[in-house]
């Protein structure tokens, strides 16, 4: 996947959602008008190959590598029988603290990035993401910029492609399907991460703006909208 950027026109848009089926604790509501100036955004999330180039050029050591551990989803450990679990998240016990887990060894010590060069880099902290962005000549987007970009020019649609999750039976993103957190039917073709260009882009030509991995923004989370 070749790195390239997309120029976005910016302008006013409605940020947030009042969708009743969402999670109130996410603080996405109420809907409010926001203006963003024109900006550029990479068409794809940062891949393992791209992050490897950054590390090779700078010698950067990620937060997870410094801590010698990171959190791995429980189902992913089946591929790494030798993984050593150190702890779990009390409120979300499917997230396990695994020794040696990092961007280079996503499932812990002994795991590799084999055949995942075009997958998004994971186990990347906010500081890691900021360092990569600066190295690549950019910066992390604000939450407003990110949401504007993710919407792809649509007004208050549920997804970057519209209001229907699988229009015409077509899967549009890589997300958990089945009984969370024990059974993922992988109906979209991917049990965990997938190549960043596995699904069609949104209306702005941006890929993986829903599903696949969580993404960082520049600003802090809050619910005091002014």
Predicted features, each with a name:
Residues 57-58:
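Non-catalytic, well-ordered alpha-helical segments in soluble enzyme domains
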Residues 31-33, 38:
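Well-ordered beta-strand positions in beta-sheet-rich domains
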């Amino acid at each position: 996947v070749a790195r390239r950027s997309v120029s976005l026109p910016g302008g006013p848009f409605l940020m947030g959602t009042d969708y009743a089926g969402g999670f109130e604790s996410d603080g996405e509501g109420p809907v409010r008008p926001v203006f963003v100036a024109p900006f550029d955004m990479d068409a794809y999330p940062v891949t393992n190959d791209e992050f490897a180039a950054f590390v090779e050029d700078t010698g950067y050591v990620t937060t997870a590598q410094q801590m010698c551990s990171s959190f791995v989803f429980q189902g992913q450990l089946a591929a790494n029988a030798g993984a050593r679990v150190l702890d779990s998240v009390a409120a979300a016990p499917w997230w396990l603290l695994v020794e040696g887990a990092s961007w280079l060894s996503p499932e812990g010590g002994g795991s590799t990035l084999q055949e995942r060069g075009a997958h998004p880099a994971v186990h990347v902290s906010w500081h890691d993401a900021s360092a990569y962005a600066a190295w690549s000549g950019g910066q992390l987007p604000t939450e407003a910029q990110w949401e504007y970009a993710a919407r792809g020019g649509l007004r208050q649609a549920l997804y970057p492609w519209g209001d229907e999750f699988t229009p015409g039976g077509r899967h549009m993103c890589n997300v958990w399907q089945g009984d969370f957190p024990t059974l993922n039917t992988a109906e979209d073709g991917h049990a965990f991460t997938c190549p960043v260009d596995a699904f069609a882009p949104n209306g702005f030509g941006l890929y993986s703006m829903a599903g696949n991995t969580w993404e960082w923004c520049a600003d802090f989370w809050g619910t005091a909208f002014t």
